[in-house]
Regions:
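Hydrophobic residues in beta-strands and at strand termini
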Residues: 37-39, 138, 161
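Conserved phosphate-binding loops in N-terminal lobes of ATP-dependent enzymes
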Residues: 2-101
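Gly/Thr-rich phosphate-binding beta-strand-loop-beta motif of the actin/hexokinase/Hsp70
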Residues: 1-29, 124, 128-159, 210-214
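Helical "lid/coupling" subdomains associated with nucleotide-phosphate turnover
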Residues: 45-69, 84-96, 102-132, 147-149, ...
Length: 307
């Protein structure tokens, strides 16, 4: 195997990357693609069992078909796949898993909450020069927090909400003052139960996830930094992060789509994705955030290569 193809099924988007194996425990990403499929769409609106909708499955399989046309052009490759919160929580996940297998020959590995958190840790530790930090990955259907001290994983948690599910629950596309208050109250209750979070006071907050990537793009566009998508290790003060949040709060969804650097497909959920960060920055008195392009997918690759 020269190339490892990784399919990554998230709650908001499905991604794939082609990674050239360059040596023991080392790889070089040579291609990355993404399709916004909103796999978790509708899952947070009903009580009881969570189900992937037929429309979301159809969008996702269409994206996989497009990806397959690309990776088949490469030689000597192996296809592996991971899935996170949306698939993990869906009672009908087998339907998607079976259809992906029929389409690609790849049997999806549905990551447990702990695996997703730990793979975030592996990715950050192998790609950023940080020894002490709090890692915060905001996905579409879940949030992962990992406390790192002296480069070692201390503790972590996966919380069962993310930008898509929070956006649906609190109507974040058109966030009223009442909805914002309800969202903040909900999040404070979740964070207050994590007593170990206080050990992260004053540490850098490492941010992963699509909404956080959008914030980095907005700031890099403001600063005229090129390329705007190259933000691994990019740092932003808490003051600057808060200013962007406050500015976006004052805009409606159509206006947010026009903000330079904003991904139009995230304009309706970005406030739901930023609000948990704002509350943590306030609670832990963090002075800055650091953005990571590497997440659970890259951590999964490191784990695969170490076996």
């Amino acid at each position: 195997m020269d190339n490892l193809v990784v399919l990554d099924f998230g709650s908001n988007s499905v991604r794939f990357s082609i990674n050239q194996i360059t040596g023991k425990n080392t790889f070089k990403e040579i291609l990355r693609r993404k399709a916004t499929t909103r796999l978790a769409e509708g899952m947070g609106l009903t009580a009881g069992e969570k189900r992937l909708t037929p429309a979301a499955i159809k969008r996702t399989l269409a994206a996989v078909a497009d990806f397959k046309k690309i990776y088949q052009q490469y030689s000597n490759y192996q296809v592996v796949g991971i899935a996170t919160a949306a698939v993990r929580e869906a009672v009908n996940r087998k339907s998607l898993i079976d259809q992906v297998y029929q389409q690609t020959g790849c049997r999806l590995q549905v990551l447990s909450a702990h695996e997703e958190t730990y793979f975030d840790y592996l990715a950050v530790m192998n790609s950023l020069l940080l020894k002490d930090c709090l890692i915060f990955d905001i996905g579409g259907g879940s949030c992962e927090l990992a406390l790192v001290k002296s480069g070692k994983f201390q503790t972590g948690v996966s919380l069962p909400f993310g930008a898509v599910s929070l956006g649906e629950k609190f109507t974040a596309a058109n966030l009223t003052a009442a909805k914002l208050f309800a969202l903040q109250t909900f999040l404070r209750k979740q964070f207050s139960a994590l007593f170990w979070l206080q050990q992260a006071s004053d540490l850098p907050l490492v941010l992963l996830g699509g909404c956080n990537r959008s914030v980095a793009r907005i700031k890099r566009t403001e600063l005229k930094l090129q390329p705007i998508d190259s933000f691994h290790g990019f740092k932003m003060t808490t003051k600057d992060f808060t200013e962007i949040y406050q500015r976006l709060l004052g805009l409606d969804n159509q206006q947010r789509k026009q903000v330079p650097g904003m991904e139009a497909m995230r304009s309706d959920i970005i406030l739901a994705g930023m609000t948990p960060v704002i509350l943590l920055l306030q609670q832990l008195h963090c002075s800055q955030v650091v953005f990571s392009e590497s997440g659970a997918r890259e951590g999964f690759i490191y784990q695969q290569l170490s076996q």
